């Protein structure tokens, strides 16, 4: 983290003037919720806020619209809940929205100017076997960053108390929330782009597994895009683990409370369950299943409501899928053959028998072939 401190040594109020007004990039703010920024942050911080230029912003309304949902960080929230314990993170981060344990705001450390500060209890996990003293979720996140498959992690701090463990992280902020929220926000995806994002996800999971890193909770809500045409990234590494789950506890004497049957959101768990998972092939079959669900999710097929019905195993699934997608809402118009071929790949990932699912390398090859073929088809 850059050795620059934008916080005032002692906060003191300043009145906004015509020359000394508060703006977030092209959005000039009326007097209100964020006047406290002038009290706590130095003039150079406010000057940077005025000059922010994110390529995703087409006008003032986009400045706050692309930050994930949340309520404004008022002076009361800042003073009581943020400022006392997080000063080390606030030196180069200005929070403007809050949602639960997440603060969204702006930082020059980020390529887009947008950043996220998260501070939350750690209930599961341990230290990374390959990096003593580094929490597994931080190790997994940094490993994903090395392959450009996660928002950049700028700073982290593990706070270990007698009865609790908390982790604070400052990182790049995604555009408009997770990939599903981004698309539902009026940005329908093409069938080619959906396949590209799926290939990026599969490639990321393969490379992480090669380094004995498993995310632990793969789903569309844990995938993001940080910049225009940028690579898909993973977030929320709280359940990250090595294959054999062997980790030392974050607190001395505490057994690591994480097992294979605990990781993964229930709706995204493959039908065979986790079991002990003694080998890489079984773990990879789980990942492929989750990639298949992502393929349906990203084009607007709500799998959570339908997965227990085995919707994709029904003979009339393509017709049902076409009606549920609602062309134009989540998916741009495409050739019918391309739509069917895409569903065929997804259904292959969702076979009940894990041995019948493709390996990640084969899935990546299938998606590459599909993308190449779709690219030669006429546009609609």
UniProtKB/Swiss-Prot annotation:
Bridged cysteine pairs (disulfide): none
InterPro entries: Kinase-like_dom_sf (IPR011009), Prot_kinase_dom (IPR000719), Ser/Thr_kinase_AS (IPR008271)
Keyword rRNA-binding belongs to the record: no
Catalytic activity: L-seryl-[protein] + ATP = O-phospho-L-seryl-[protein] + ADP + H(+); L-threonyl-[protein] + ATP = O-phospho-L-threonyl-[protein] + ADP + H(+)
One MF annotation (Gene Ontology) recorded for this entry: protein serine/threonine kinase activity
EC category: transferase
Domain Protein kinase: 93-371
Residue numbers binding ATP: 118
Keyword Transferase recorded: yes
Keyword line: ATP-binding, Kinase, Nucleotide-binding, Serine/threonine-protein kinase, Transferase
EC number: 2.7.11.1
Active site: 217
Similarity comment text for this entry: Belongs to the protein kinase superfamily. Ser/Thr protein kinase family.
Name listed for the protein in its UniProt record: Protein kinase ORF15
Species of the source: Ictalurid herpesvirus 1 (strain Auburn) (IcHV-1)
């Amino acid at each position: 983290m850059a050795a620059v401190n934008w916080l005032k040594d002692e906060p003191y109020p300043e009145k906004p003037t015509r020359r000394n007004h508060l703006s977030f990039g092209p959005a000039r703010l009326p007097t209100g919720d964020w006047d406290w920024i002038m009290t706590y942050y130095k003039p150079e911080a406010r000057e940077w806020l005025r000059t922010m230029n994110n390529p995703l912003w087409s006008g003032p309304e986009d400045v706050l619209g692309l930050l994930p949902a949340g309520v404004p960080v008022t002076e009361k929230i800042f003073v009581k809940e943020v400022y006392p314990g997080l000063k080390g993170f606030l030196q180069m981060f200005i929070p403007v929205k809050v949602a639960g344990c997440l603060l969204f705001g702006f930082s020059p450390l980020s390529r887009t100017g947008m950043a996220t500060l998260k501070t939350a209890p750690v209930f599961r996990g341990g230290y990374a076997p390959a990096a003593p003293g580094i929490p597994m979720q931080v190790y997994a996140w940094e490993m994903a960053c090395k392959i450009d498959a996660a928002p950049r992690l700028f700073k982290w701090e593990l706070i270990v108390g007698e009865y609790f463990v908390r982790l604070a992280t400052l990182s790049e902020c995604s555009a408009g929330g997770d990939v599903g929220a981004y698309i539902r926000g009026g940005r329908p995806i093409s069938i080619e782009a959906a396949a590209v994002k799926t290939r990026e996800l599969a490639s990321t999971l393969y490379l992480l597994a090669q380094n004995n890193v498993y995310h632990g909770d793969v789903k569309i809500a844990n995938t993001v895009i940080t910049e225009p045409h940028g690579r898909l990234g993973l977030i929320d590494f709280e359940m990250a683990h090595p294959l054999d789950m062997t980790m030392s506890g974050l607190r001395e004497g505490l057994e690591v409370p994480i097992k294979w049957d605990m990781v993964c959101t229930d709706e995204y768990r493959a039908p065979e369950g986790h079991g002990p998972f003694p080998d890489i092939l079984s773990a990879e079959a789980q990942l492929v299943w989750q990639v298949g669900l992502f393929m349906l999710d990203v084009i607007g097929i709500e799998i959570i409501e339908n997965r227990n019905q085995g919707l994709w195993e029904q003979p009339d699934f393509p017709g049902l899928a076409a009606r549920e997608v609602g062309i134009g809402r989540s998916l741009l118009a495409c050739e019918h053959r391309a739509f069917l071929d895409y569903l065929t790949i997804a259904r292959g990932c969702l076979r009940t028998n894990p041995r019948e699912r493709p390996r990640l390398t084969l899935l990546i090859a299938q998606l590459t072939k599909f993308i190449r073929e779709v690219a030669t088809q006429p546009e609609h």
